[in-house]
From Swiss-Prot:
Protein name: L-lactate dehydrogenase
Organism: Streptococcus thermophilus (strain CNRZ 1066)
Major place of residence: cytoplasm
Subcellular location: Cytoplasm
Annotated control of activity: Allosterically activated by fructose 1,6-bisphosphate (FBP).
Phylogenetic placement of the source organism: Bacteria, Bacillati, Bacillota, Bacilli, Lactobacillales
Record carries keyword Transferase: no
Residues reported to bind beta-D-fructose 1,6-bisphosphate: R159, H174
Pathway: Fermentation; pyruvate fermentation to lactate; (S)-lactate from pyruvate: step 1/1
Annotated HAMAP family: Lactate_dehydrog (MF_00488)
Family to which the UniProt record says this protein belongs: Belongs to the LDH/MDH superfamily. LDH family.
EC number: 1.1.1.27
A GO molecular function held by the record: L-lactate dehydrogenase activity
Length: 328
């Protein structure tokens, strides 16, 4: 996609709670000029209904073509966003979803590529780091054009939690969660800052904030999805807005730095997997990863998180079906 292209087209695969919330966010924010929504045949009418419902919001936002799409509509899309997958149930981890969602992912990616699609994949289905890897393997696309939502939502949760604790605007909090989007993720405390002031320095004026509270704060961030799932069944608003932000960065060629699921080529001593870290993203996908220097404890957590993902991938790829479908 060229940065000067005026008509920008997004295809969404999966019109469940996350997908439909993402579509609503795109309409609300006036992102893209065309949005096609793909669903499985038995849910095609839901996609038709959502497209019609969303189109009624356009007089309040900006013009956009919205419709229930087929896989052949991916051919000239700039971005294909994959939210389709088996939902995470109460008591399930994201990694419990691997077997079910790898098969779904293979079917989706194969059909998208067969359409002649030559844009960028953005993956949000869980476990997102594993499914970003499988999208890369099944598509044969360059690693720069396969992106996972990674720790974008986790980092937003972290910033919001710190903002509430410190009574500042979350937009002035700069802090990252890295690693797996899941149980082995970790907070990069060493680089957290408030408007450029290191968090440790900022806290000197906040004597009532104890270290134990910060540990508890992170645990709340890490476990936020479980909390929400137990209370309302699923998470979708936060990730939908995170996906809209990533979409805008790609379509508008922003070269924005966002925490995404990014291919590893030796950074942090990790290779050949996708995992959450900051990266520059624009019209051609990942421009380059931003390798934040980690302290020893953080580096160990990154390696442990990567090892966990690698073990899951190694086990999954014992399946001959996935081996045969791999193009990378």
């Amino acid at each position: 996609m060229t940065a000067t292209k005026l008509h920008k087209k997004v295809i969404l695969v999966g019109d469940g709670a996350v997908g439909s919330s993402y579509a609503f966010a795109l309409v609300n924010q006036g992102i893209a000029q065309e949005l096609g929504i793909i669903e499985i045949p038995q849910l095609f009418e839901k996609a038709v209904g959502d497209a019609l419902d969303l189109s009624h919001a356009l007089p309040f936002t900006s013009p956009k073509k919205i419709y229930a799409a087929k896989y052949e509509d991916c051919a000239d899309a700039d971005l294909v966003v994959i939210t389709a997958g088996a939902p995470q149930k109460p008591g399930e981890t994201r990694l419990d979803l691997v077997g079910k969602n790898l098969a779904i992912n293979k079917s989706i990616v194969t059909q998208v590529v067969e359409s002649g699609f030559n844009g960028i994949f953005l993956v949000a289905a869980n476990p997102v780091d594993v499914l970003t890897y499988s999208t890369w393997k099944f598509s044969g696309f360059p690693k720069e054009r396969v992106i996972g939502s990674g720790t974008s939502l986790d980092s937003a949760r972290f910033r919001q939690a710190l903002a509430e604790k410190l009574n500042v605007d979350a937009r002035s909090v700069h802090a990252y969660i890295m690693g797996e989007h899941g149980d082995s993720e970790f907070a990069v405390w060493s680089h957290a800052n408030i408007a450029g002031v290191n968090l440790e320095e900022f806290l000197k004026d906040k004597e009532n904030v104890q270290e134990a509270e910060l540990v508890e704060l992170f645990e709340g961030v890490r476990d936020a999805a479980y909390t929400i799932i137990n209370k309302k069944g699923a998470t979708y608003y936060g990730i939908a807005v995170a996906l809209a932000r990533i979409t805008k960065a790609i379509l508008d060629d922003e070269n924005a730095v966002l925490p995404l699921s990014v291919f590893q080529e030796g950074q942090y001593g990790v290779n050949n997997i996708f995992i959450g870290q900051p990266a520059i993203v624009g019209a051609h996908g990942i421009v380059r990863p931003v390798n934040i220097p980690l302290n020893d404890a953080e580096q160990q957590k990154m390696k442990a998180s990567a090892d966990e993902l690698q073990a899951i991938i190694d086990e999954a790829w014992k399946n001959p079906e996935f081996q045969e479908a791999s193009k990378n």
